[in-house]
Amino acid sequence: MYSAVTRGIEVTVEPFYLEVQSEPEENRYVWGYRVTIVNNSSETVQLCSRYWQITDANGHVQEVRGSGVVGEQPVLDPGASYQYSSGCPLTTSSGVMVGRYQMKGEDGAQFEIEIPAFSLDVPEQRRTLN
């Protein structure tokens, strides 16, 4: 698992290879990832948008921006957590993802929190990208 804390908000990511959905002979590799966001701060916050930077083993970069996550813009009270799962296809057997969430505090001010960098690796070809 990979974890980062920004302003008392912890983001943990657990990636996993989806062998059943992958077709290596067609250069199609698919991973899922489970994200848990825990609000350890003293204020209620809302997740407004997301930004991902996805880099494959050949150095090709894809950027993904969007409103909320999985169709939601969750509100997290102090001590609350939110979890969701999503996926990422690549044309290489490894890659790395990193990103950030745009959050809104109780006063309406927006701020960014870090999504930790995490590697996407085919289990039998495990390697880490920095």
Curated annotation (Swiss-Prot):
Top-level taxon of origin: Bacteria
Gene3D superfamilies: ApaG domain (2.60.40.1470)
PANTHER family listed in its UniProt record: F-BOX ONLY PROTEIN 3 (PTHR14289), POLYMERASE DELTA-INTERACTING PROTEIN 2 (PTHR14289:SF16)
Residue intervals of the ApaG domain: 3-127
Gene for this chain: apaG
NCBIfam families the record matches: PRK05461.1
HAMAP family assigned to the protein according to its UniProt record, in alphabetical order: ApaG
Gene Ontology BP, a term: error-free translesion synthesis
Protein's name in the database: Protein ApaG
Species the sequence originates in: Brucella suis biovar 1 (strain 1330)
